[in-house]
Regions:
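Extracellular fibronectin type III
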Residues: 581-602
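Beta-strand-rich modules
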Residues: 565-588
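Aromatic/acidic polysaccharide-binding cleft in carbohydrate-active enzymes
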Residues: 257-403, 407-409
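Substrate-binding cleft and catalytic face of glycoside hydrolase catalytic domains
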Residues: 62-227, 240, 247, 263
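Short beta-strand segments within Ig-like beta-sandwich modules, predominantly Fibronectin type-III
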Residues: 475-476, 553-560
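Carbohydrate-binding surface patches
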Residues: 368-445, 491-497, 534
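Conserved aromatic anchor
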Residues: 520-535
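C-terminal beta-strand-rich structural cap/linker in extracellular carbohydrate-active enzymes
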Residues: 453-502, 576
């Protein structure tokens, strides 16, 4: 059955929910000239689009075919519950039925399957939701991994036409792109280049017309350990596409596997810590400044994504290409899984604080202006308010990154000057900071002796290093100008968040639900869909044995919509509620309380 391509197969619902919800510098040994970062909060440059975010049986599809959607329903329901949208690759051969897409009967059957699938989820979730999905062709067709399906060049074109017409039969609003491959220069990558030619000049298998729609061009270009190499390859491919197929000059371009390095399971120490986190931010800043926001660039760049929806395995819980470190804890009955946020997920939480209007920002050193292809860079944004629950805010995200290299005794001297901040009620600023000394669960795991099955206390110690270090809100200078001086280790991230006080406190937390982890531990997840402001200090989690008197159980501030409750007493049966607290210590309404009753020990 066609399904979203995420590996490895078989994670349980708790792991999927956790993945879905997951997100002191040393003196410099090598002296460098200080970096000056200037940001003008009154000078908006351009929009800042975040290019980087029932029964299971169905009626017969004809020809005596029927499909069991039970597992796919469950997975897509879980994504929907966690407010996520899939990139949906139309690939696979249910029960081995499909074997040859030059067989006309199978081409018609594939079209019917795609149409059936699309209609099913339009009926289930609504067209408004499903039309936001990115449907895409078979993953990396030039690698010829077709699950025992014979896929000639003509067969691949027939398959594409069936995907296109199947989706169109369900709704013309559904988009389809491809080929999701590397586009090596011709004569290499014949299916990728051939698909572009077919979409322009080929004959549609079903309509007989010349040409087939291609709503976006999907590339897979990775960095070989270099941040700028990703962008350089994208530009080279787009130049060649425009040279060979100028009709695609205005077609949106996706790089939905823009990873720093190939090989998700290859253990790399830098993937475990802030090195990876800072590099991801650097790649995004490079794309915004050198491509998306560059008026001289003709690339219609629409989406950057990383291929990191994997679950790590022993003995490399942290160092594979994942967002979370996975521990398979086999010394409990039954065995269970624990996931820890890696710094790369924490960095994505910082990126989420950026808003929709890019601000003028510049980095210089010794008087020379530096572009985004240097060790220190910046991305800044502002938000104009809409409504009483909202107010003006700005975010300045500074990275210090030497790509995949970490330098224990090297730092960058930074002077950050933010000016042009308009006066506003209760104006405050908060800083968030990530480095390998303060924010590394991996480093804590090493200090604990790299336990294979960490104890609850050891997990608590590692989780204490998951989030950025946050400084409490401080009044913003009345002059509208702020100067901060820092030594930024390589690697590190610093975000400065400036907020005026909204008239209203935070909205209500919704969709609170508890999920069991193991005996004496549970996971709470919730939604922030009613939060009109991003200026939140923390979520306060409270617990009650009887639903009457509640007490806080969350400690350090965190704005991730997830909390692991692992008390020393291992008593977790009771009632839970959560509320948001903003930068001005104003709480929002509590969520509706939920009750959790732990299953008796077996």
């Amino acid at each position: 059955m066609p399904a979203s391509a995420e590996c490895p197969p078989g994670p349980g619902p708790v792991q999927l929910v956790l993945l879905a919800a997951l997100l002191a510098s040393s003196p410099a040994a090598l002296a460098e000239a200080p970096h000056l970062v200037r940001v003008d909060a009154a000078r908006a440059l351009r929009p800042l689009r975040h290019f980087w975010r029932s029964t299971g049986f169905w009626r017969s599809a004809g020809q005596g075919l029927s499909y069991n959607f039970t597992h796919l329903d469950g997975y897509l329901d879980l994504l929907r519950e966690n407010q996520l949208l899939p990139g949906f690759e139309l690939m696979g051969s249910p029960s081995g039925h499909f074997s040859d897409f030059e067989d006309k009967q199978q081409v018609f059957e594939w079209r019917e399957l795609v149409s059936l699938l699309a209609r099913r989820y339009i009926d289930r979730y609504g067209l408004e939701h499903v039309s936001k999905w990115n449907f895409e062709t078979w993953n990396e067709p030039d690698h010829h991994d077709f699950d025992n399906v014979s896929m000639t060049t003509q067969g691949f074109f027939n398959y594409y036409d069936a995907c296109s017409e199947g989706l169109r039969a369900a709704s013309p609003a559904l988009r389809l792109g491809g080929p999701g491959d590397s586009f090596h220069p011709p004569p290499h990558s014949p299916l990728s280049w051939g698909l572009l030619g077919h979409c322009l000049h080929g004959t549609n298998f079903f309509t007989g017309e010349v040409g087939v729609r291609l709503d976006y061009i999907a590339l897979h270009k990775k960095g070989a350990g270099s941040s700028i190499y990703i962008l350089e390859q994208e530009e080279a491919v787009v130049r060649q596409i425009k040279q060979l197929f100028p009709e695609f000059a205005d077609t949106p371009v996706y790089n939905d596997e823009a990873d720093p390095l190939v090989g998700w399971s290859l253990p790399q120490p830098w993937r475990a810590d802030v090195t990876y986190a800072a590099m991801v931010v650097k790649v995004i800043a490079q794309h915004q400044d050198l491509l998306v926001g560059n008026s001289s660039s003709s690339v219609r760049y629409a989406l950057l994504s990383n291929d990191n929806a994997f679950l790590s395995y022993h003995p490399h819980p942290f160092s594979q290409r994942t967002l979370a470190a996975r521990f398979q804890v086999n010394n409990t009955r039954p065995p269970h899984v624990q996931l820890l946020r890696k710094p790369v997920l924490a960095a994505m939480g910082l990126l989420a604080l950026l808003d929709g209007e890019q601000l003028w920002a510049q980095v210089s050193q010794d008087g020379a202006v530096l572009d985004a292809n240097h060790t220190v860079g910046v991305l800044a944004s502002a938000h104009r308010p809409a409504g009483a629950a909202d107010a003006w805010r700005a975010a300045v995200l500074v990275y210090a990154s030497d790509d995949t290299r970490a330098h224990a005794n090297r730092s960058a001297a930074l002077t950050l000057r933010l000016h042009g901040v308009p006066p506003g009620p209760g104006l405050v600023y908060v800083t968030f900071y990530l480095d390998n000394q303060l924010c590394s669960p991996y480093g804590e795991w090493q200090r604990l002796g790299r336990p294979v099955f960490p104890s609850p206390e050891q997990f608590r110690r590692m989780r204490a290093a998951e989030d950025p270090v946050a400084t409490a809100p401080r009044p913003f200078p009345a002059s509208g100008r702020l100067t901060l001086r820092r030594e930024l280790p390589l690697p590190s991230l610093l975000l400065v968040h400036v907020c005026a006080r909204p008239e209203e406190p935070p909205g209500q937390v919704t969709r609170l639900r508890p999920l069991p982890l193991t005996r004496g531990q549970l996971l709470l997840v919730w939604s922030d869909e009613r939060m009109a402001s991003k200026c939140l200090w923390t979520y306060e989690v409270q617990f009650s044995l009887d639903g009457q008197g509640y007490a806080p159980v969350s400690g350090r501030p965190s704005t991730f919509n997830l909390f692991v409750f692992s008390p020393d007493a291992a008593v977790v049966s009771g009632f839970y509620r959560v509320r948001a607290v903003d930068y001005w210590a104003r709480p929002g309404p509590f969520s509706d309380p939920v009750r959790y009753v732990e299953a008796p020990a077996q």
